[in-house]
Amino acid sequence: MNITELNGRPLRLLIGGSPCTYWSIAQKNNRETEAEGLGWELFKNYLIAKEKFNPDLFLYENNKSASQAIKDQIVHELGYPLQVIDSALVSAQKRLRFYVKNWECPLPEDRGILLKDILELSESVVEKEKAYCLCTDHVWTTRDYFKKHQSQIVFEPVRIGDIGSNSQAHRVYSCYGKSVNLVANGGGQGAKTGLYFVPLPEELEKLVCDKGKIYKVENHTIPTKFGDFNVNLPDGLYIIRKLTVTEAARLQTMPDNYMKSVSAQQGYKGLGNGWTAEVIIHQLKYGLKDIPKDYPIEVLSMYDGIGTGRYCLDKMGYTNVTYKAYEIDKYAMTVANDNYPDIIQCGDAFQLREDDWAY
């Protein structure tokens, strides 16, 4: 965007992604595959916003799994090609989304971020390099992970006890066990005093600790009530847990405490419905590359969710932003305004169809 084309008026930016519930391949019943139905009506609100708001720049996002017929019609309506970007390039999550925008930008370079890089606990491990796509459903189960290849779980080596104190060097784990533990002798840190192998108590297998059931990995196989599964983990004892809200935020490249104003359940949901921030930032950098950081920007955000668009502009350093958002989920709005009180909440996106609508 060339700033001289604006003649001193604020730059107008339209962003949004209509809810993908009706189009996603994850929709088991009554999935919409043609450019009609409620899913298409939600998209039409974005089209109406584009017509009435008359933005200088616009960015639209949705799930890659939408049918080709729907994607083709979106391209026809918006007049620009779609670009598929996998969030795995800039995060630890596999998340395929398509974007349509009225400027060009290349794919992001692969930053080499792995799932293990975003875990809160250093002793936690994962067997895959990238997480499955974050979804809105917070009830993630071991069965979903192993049998459906959905959700994401984390393996924590079982902590057996302490030797002498609770300091990090004296904790006993079955980290890379092969039926043994590492323990630290007294007199200082394990690195200084030496480590000794002791037999791993077999009676711990199949017991339940304070964090859940204990699983034994042997020969890269983990037995569960759903069957035996191959895992890329060293032999040893593990408990299985889901990602924390902080880890889920990191998958979406959002700040650790961004969801602090709502429950964990709503935190997972809001993040699952949201954007991968660094993917949006990468694209906006090209659209706004010639715009000074203090230049006035008027944003219209459709289906705003947790305010990721506002966060992106803030992280990019833009300081003169008017941000109006259409959203109806009260928890998402709570998160958005907790982080950015300047977001102006406008309510239901269908209000844009009113004859007297104005920004």
What spans do the regions from the language model cover?
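Conserved active-site and SAM-binding loop architecture
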Residues: M1-Y359
